[in-house]
Regions:
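Accessory terminal regions of nucleic-acid processing enzymes
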Residues: 1-306
Length: 306
């Protein structure tokens, strides 16, 4: 592999360096394994669609906590010298890039890459099994970073973010030539699909927002013939059952809330139920005007029911 190393001089420059490439942080989307990004979103992003570079609370937490995780690793693995990575690494032929969080020096095996993560307690237990394992999407990220930097090994440090106990787990990710070949093959296939205009199948659990980009408006008078779709009738029946169940739950919820209000009458709050905080207060809502806009509305009804 021919690898380019480009020094990072600022965040905007770094973001621009990443734009032409599939990067290690999202390569798992090509395997349907990324928790936030799908192959379709990646395809659209590299087909001219501009997405906001949102810096949400989770990303901000990870960025701010990154030095703390590295410090914790230094305390637990005193033989390692941890160095912040200041460069972007890319294979220009494959258009695959990576920026490891840190490099590890001082290990007898040679250079290592360190990926730092933070996790809420329930995520730490559910996805990381209490620090015993690394989620598949993170494994793919670290394997890509190690491959592009020609590191001897990779490691992941995850810090459980808890107000009273900042537990740290360090899990090594060995180089895996077969897995690395699969990563390279998936990236090469992705770029072939982009060039040929072959759109990946959507991930229905992640891609709802992409419909606003793909089909923001209907073409008046057009129809789509789904008579050959054998799966859809059963799914529509399933949806009908779910909607009926939701209506039943909502009706019962309203009954319980009405009963509670009658018991409270003009009281502002409830005492005597130590497990529950209940109040019924008046709230002033300012007048506001909703700006006009066109919104596509999906309506489904069973033709055998009125």
């Amino acid at each position: 592999m021919k690898i380019e190393r480009i020094e990072i001089t600022g965040r905007d420059q770094w973001l621009n360096l990443r734009k032409p490439d599939v990067t290690a942080s999202v390569v798992a989307a090509l395997f349907g394994a990324h928790p936030y990004t799908s192959a379709l979103k990646l395809y659209l992003a590299h087909s001219g669609v501009e997405f906001d570079q949102a810096d949400d609370r989770v990303l901000r937490r990870g960025r701010l906590m990154e030095p703390a995780v590295a410090l914790a690793v230094s305390e637990e693995r005193a033989e390692w010298q941890i160095e912040k990575c200041d460069s972007y690494y890319r294979d220009p032929d494959l258009r695959l890039g990576a920026t490891p969080d840190f490099f590890i020096h001082g290990d007898p095996r040679g250079l290592g890459v360190l990926q730092t993560k933070t996790a809420a307690p329930h995520i730490f237990e559910r996805d990381w099994e209490g620090g015993a394992t690394v989620p598949f999407w993170v494994q793919l990220q670290v394997l890509t970073e190690a491959m592009l930097t020609e590191a001897a090994f990779g490691a992941v440090a995850v810090l459980r973010v808890d107000a009273f106990d900042l537990a740290l787990a360090i899990v090594e990710v060995p180089r895996h030539p077969a897995a690395e070949q699969r990563i390279k093959a998936a990236v090469a296939q992705f770029w072939e699909d982009v060039a040929a205009g072959r759109e990946p199948d959507p991930d229905y659990g992640k891609d709802a927002e992409l419909l606003k980009v793909i089909a923001p408006h209907e073409v008046v008078g057009t129809t789509v013939d789904l008579s050959g779709d054998n799966e859809l009738p059963a799914l529509l029946e399933q949806r009908e059952e779910i909607m009926t169940g939701i209506k039943g739950f909502e009706a019962r919820k309203d009954e319980i809330e009405t009963m509670l209000k009658f018991k409270m009458r003009d009281a502002e709050s409830v005492v005597g139920l130590p497990e529950w905080g209940i109040s019924w207060k008046s709230q002033h809502r300012k007048e506001f005007v909703v700006p006009a806009k066109d919104v596509r509305t999906l309506r489904i009804h069973h033709k055998g029911q009125r």
